[in-house]
Amino acid sequence: MPQTLSASDMVTPGSLSPPTTEPTDGEQAGQPLLDGAPSSASLETLIQHLVPTADYYPEKAYIFTFLLSSRLFIEPRELLARVCHLCIEQQQLDKPVLDKARVRKFGPKLLQLLAEWTETFPRDFQEESTIGQLKDVVGRIAPCDETYRKRMHQLLQALHQKLAALRQGPEGLVSADKPISYRTKPPASIHRELLGVCSDPYTLAQQLTHVELERLRHIGPEEFVQAFVNKDPLASTKPCFSDKTSHLEAYVKWFNRLCYLVATEICMPAKKKQRAQVIEFFIDVARECFNIGNFNSLMAIISGMNMSPVSRLKKTWAKVKTAKFFILEHQMDPTGNFCNYRTALRGAAHRSLTAHSSREKIVIPFFSLLIKDIYFLNEGCANRLPNGHVNFEKFLELAKQVGEFITWKQVECPFEQDPSITHYLSTAPIFSEDGLYLASYESESPENQTEKERWKSLRSSILGKT
């Protein structure tokens, strides 16, 4: 069924080589996790591990894990200020005379950290003050090597391009269409149906994949954390993340839209033979989505066909060859925490890792289940331990799940876009739930007293009839 985005429903770790600083806050050095990473540490120590020196650079996986999870405890702009301050302090960049040999070893590492940060979390740098901090710290090392200034210019140029692309977004990304309640089924001469736009299941599955990847591309990894953020008991600042998950929410709304679009297209035709043809068409589209690795569209199509206004059309379903549909339902069966789907997802992920073509790289997970997995990971483990240390072990697992998703969403779609099809998918009118029931009852009359009473109520509220 269509998904809602509420807290109740939404539900490559690397090694860490510590820099040459002493543990703080009385903590013991070396509380090892996998490959030497700490299972917990104070926030200050974790920040220190992020800061490069002339002889140290943090592991890439540590950088991603900490930048992803740190926003639960400290705002990104404040973290950047702390990192810049530590760099200036440790490398003595505020002195009138710099140790050029030391700075030349440190400079490339600092620029690499800033490049990784701006590349993976560009939204952390939307405020002018953060750009000013970048320019200030790089400006302090620039006298030692003029190429630093050039690299900084390239970094900022790439950042501005990323932010501009994120602001633009695909068609109808954030402001999802509100369902339209038809007063009655429009005449066939007026209503433009999907089969009139695209009658080939494989082509439609490809275009759905296009839409999915385009919308996925705009979801930042930080949105997974910000969707569930609670005020940290040791933090002094108020959480400010309620407006920072717009792309994640829009993607869940897209899933709902596709569910309702499928149901609308099925309930719209006047004749049961035509409705049966539409159902069989969507079964074939769903099968092609499965073969491609587009599990989100697959689940939306199955959910749309399982909506009550569609499933109650018994005379229509009697004309449908359902064997392929039952196979797909079995693959997405929620039994055993979606064990069949998870097996298929692992297979698609393995295929992606060993892919010889861009088509084989495609993995689009059932998104609401991914959100739910992350939600329960967040709810099941405390962010801090009783001693106040950050539970870094939890965030390694969080980063593993989010990092895998980031890899999948960066795949370039190998299918050529058909604007007429993708535009229809994003903008075609759809019934509301009440509109669907009314259309369903008009297609096949109510069978029991409950349905008759609902039909009468809908005719009164939507059509003004008694």
UniProtKB/Swiss-Prot annotation:
Residues 34-164 form the N-terminal Ras-GEF domain. Disulfide bonds: none annotated. It holds the Pfam family RasGEF_N. One of its GO terms (biological process) is Ras protein signal transduction. PROSITE patterns: RASGEF, RASGEF_CAT, RASGEF_NTER. Guanine nucleotide exchange factor (GEF). The gene is RASGEF1C. PANTHER family: GUANINE NUCLEOTIDE EXCHANGE FACTOR, RAS-GEF DOMAIN-CONTAINING FAMILY MEMBER 1C. GO terms for cellular component: plasma membrane. Residues 1-23 have a biased composition (Polar residues). CDD domains: RasGEF, REM. SUPFAM superfamilies: Ras GEF. It comes from Macaca fascicularis. Keywords: Guanine-nucleotide releasing factor. Residues 1-35, 443-466 are annotated as: Disordered. Residues 200-446 form the Ras-GEF domain. One of its GO terms (molecular function) is guanyl-nucleotide exchange factor activity. This is Ras-GEF domain-containing family member 1C. The lineage of its organism: Eukaryota, Metazoa, Chordata, Craniata, Vertebrata.
